[in-house]
Regions:
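Solvent-exposed edge beta-strands and adjacent loop segments
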Residues: 1-75, 112-126
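A generic structural signal for short coil/turn motifs at secondary-structure boundaries
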Residues: 80-82, 119-120
Length: 151
């Protein structure tokens, strides 16, 4: 049993409609990403300061964080690609759910995001698909919500 949310995670996707996964969503497992490539990154929100003469800060506020989910998939013989793209652009809005290797640990759900892909090739890895999910404001709640399977 793990204490933290690490290891081989299960990454699943479904369609997002009106800012949330559709009705009772049917989550579809994505092929296992390349080792060490699945990551959720937060970018700190913009800091806004009210300055008085002399440059002293009277007040400050910060906008909300922005989030991005990234992962790389191998192109494998006999397997279909997870999404069709048009020169890197993947149509529609998507939702993602990540369940850690130890299902009792906390993962996350993203209700709404856009998805793009960058294709590359090296002789070491073959054809790789680098997916980038830009997280968008959901219908309700936080942009990245905690998720624990069975909870």
């Amino acid at each position: 049993m793990a204490t933290i949310s690490w290891g081989k995670a299960l990454l699943e996707t479904t369609t997002s409609n009106d800012g949330a996964p559709e009705g009772t969503p049917t989550w579809k497992a994505i092929d296992t990403p390349k080792d060490g490539t699945t990551k959720l990154t937060a970018t700190a929100g913009q800091e806004i300061e009210a300055l008085e003469e002399g440059g002293e800060v009277v007040d400050s506020r910060r906008s909300k964080n922005k989030y991005q989910l990234e992962f790389d998939l191998f192109v494998k013989k006999g397997k279909e690609r997870a999404w069709e793209d048009n020169d890197g652009i993947i149509a529609g809005e998507h939702a993602f759910r990540l369940t850690p290797e130890d299902e009792g640990c906390e993962g996350f759900i993203i209700d709404r995001c856009t998805l793009s892909v960058e294709e590359s090739f090296t002789t070491a890895d073959g054809i790789m698909l680098h997916y980038v999910a830009k997280v968008l404001k959901p219908k309700t709640g936080k942009m990245v919500k905690p998720y624990t399977k069975g909870a």
